[in-house]
């Protein structure tokens, strides 16, 4: 039987996450032992989404195409090549099956066509930390308040999963100061398909290590290391001995086959250490290394960015390129064309949840900025709000026709980050820029 006469239907192991413009296929969303390398999302544009939602086993592939084309007054003949290519791809990825006769199959869905719902969530388990880092955007410390209860955490995790979230990140503060850190770690690894664990690496205990080993096929552990010089790292992190303990943890986890990504916060004292840090990371056995300049949020506002000097910036860019060329197997670089999205998705595709239940678009947004409280407010009231719709529709400065780019002294700072665009308007400019005005974000600037 030719594919045209067969009856396509979405597999029961696939969930269609609906968005206002298209959707996402969540493959194997129920299987709890999917490895990081095997788990995947498939983005659907509006047409592909509408076609998939017709695939319930009751119509032939040919009938589905004809119905879809009739909606838009198009000829099936003009679309059949890419359509049947898509069907073959979906079949190869086990998203659909092709039946020989009509039979009704229910399509499992999450999300909404009316408003965006997130696919990824970051949980801040606590704002407490055993360190007091010089650049911390949350201004965490041993004295900081805020720790989510295990009961509230599980309730929230269940709600997020049921509404489409399949990947998550757990962070702090420092997650391992939470009294129920291991129970939470076990819960998220059973619940979600991909889990990132962010830690400073100074509080790793045997029980935590055993859990990470058990779930290593779906875990990425992110650990901060900021210098090859122990004194520089310890001073930056606010505790003597933290460098040695962090290096020990990186090696320990790596030796047990756990994927470790080391992150470096770059500032004036360590900016010429990136090469040596990459080598150090490789020697410790980690699989990935990333670095970012300290952002001017939280305590980071007090740290001066040294590359504001044009000549210094030029020299650093040359140095950086040499490092990337030498360690391209270790430093993940996203091709520019893959960055060309309207925005990063903060606030609608991914969210951050504080220990108090306050929802922020991303970790760098100030603690006072809230889209709503997920412990008390309904899902719809949070994500169907005018603010979330505004963030979903906003073009990041780099990709907005309203950004003056070449004429703006802040274009390099803002780049593809709409938070930095908001931040520059709130703290670095005398007047609201054309990007913020035309993207209708003037009121959001005042919330930062």
Swiss-Prot record:
Gene Ontology CC: one annotated term: cytoplasm
Compartments reported by the entry: Cytoplasm
Factors inducing expression: Transcription is highly induced by oxygen limitation and is under dual and independent control of Spo0A-AbrB and ResDE.
Residues at which [4Fe-4S] cluster 2 binds: 408, 414, 417
Any single biological process term in GO: bacteriocin biosynthetic process
Annotated TM spans: none
Keyword terms: 4Fe-4S, Antibiotic biosynthesis, Bacteriocin biosynthesis, Cytoplasm, Iron, Iron-sulfur, Metal-binding, Oxidoreductase, S-adenosyl-L-methionine
Cofactor: how bound: Binds 2 [4Fe-4S] clusters. One cluster is coordinated with 3 cysteines and an exchangeable S-adenosyl-L-methionine, the other is coordinated via 3 cysteines and maybe direct contact with the SboA precursor.
Keyword Ion transport attached: no
Enzyme Commission number(s): 1.21.98.-
Cofactor dependency: [4Fe-4S] cluster
Keyword Iron-sulfur annotated: yes
Class of the enzyme per the UniProt entry, highest EC level: oxidoreductase
GO MF annotations, alphabetized: 4 iron, 4 sulfur cluster binding; metal ion binding; oxidoreductase activity
Gene3D superfamilies according to UniProt: Aldolase class I, Coenzyme PQQ synthesis protein D (PqqD)
Outcome (variant: residue 309 to N): In strain: ATCC 6633
Binding site for [4Fe-4S] cluster 1: 129, 133, 136
InterPro entries: 4Fe4S-binding_SPASM_dom, Aldolase_TIM, Elp3/MiaA/NifB-like_rSAM, PQQD, PqqD_sf, Radical_SAM_PqqE_MftC-like, rSAM
CDD domains: Radical_SAM, SPASM_AlbA-like
Function: Catalyzes the formation of 3 thioether bonds during production of the sactipeptide subtilosin from SboA. In vitro the thioether bonds cannot be made in the absence of the SboA propeptide, suggesting this is the first reaction in subtilosin maturation. In vitro, in the absence of a second substrate, cleaves S-adenosyl-L-methionine into Met and 5'-dA.
The protein, known as: Antilisterial bacteriocin subtilosin biosynthesis protein AlbA
Source species of the chain: Bacillus subtilis (strain 168)
Source species taxonomy: Bacteria, Bacillati, Bacillota, Bacilli, Bacillales
